[in-house]
């Protein structure tokens, strides 16, 4: 037996349908597309969300909300992510250098999630009450 002698077991694989290849195939002539009309043509599909001229759902519902521009330049950092920063002083720039936050971020807030394992000095970064208590309990301090 060689690789070129291998073949699947009889009846284990079905032939794929080839529309438009004779009436005996069951998909001859119109090829399962029906007679005339937009969807019988090649490329004849309607846009997603089109409802036949009826006012579409996304235009019937009211607009609401907005995207806050403040969210663009602010970020939240977990306590566990502070371990990625080398050095004892953690600032916004040191977080950027350690790839913890994106380069365009200007303000950061530390959240209580995870653990801080070493004493660090936080410089110019806000923190929640719980995060501040956890950092100070580990021997760290805050500088404005």
Curated annotation (Swiss-Prot):
* PROSITE patterns noted in UniProt: RIBOSOMAL_L15
Q: Which UniProt keywords apply?
A: Ribonucleoprotein, Ribosomal protein, RNA-binding, rRNA-binding
| Stretches with biased composition (Gly residues) | 21-31
Has keyword Kinase? no
Cellular component, GO annotation: cytosolic large ribosomal subunit
* Keyword set includes Cell wall biogenesis/degradation: no
Instruction: Cite a single Pfam family from the UniProt record.
Output: Ribosomal_L27A
Write out the GO biological process terms: translation
Q: Which family does it belong to?
A: Belongs to the universal ribosomal protein uL15 family.
Q: How does it assemble?
A: Part of the 50S ribosomal subunit.
| Biological role | Binds to the 23S rRNA.
> Which PANTHER family does the record match to this protein?
50S RIBOSOMAL PROTEIN L15 (PTHR12934), LARGE RIBOSOMAL SUBUNIT PROTEIN UL15M (PTHR12934:SF11)
Please state what the protein is called: Large ribosomal subunit protein uL15
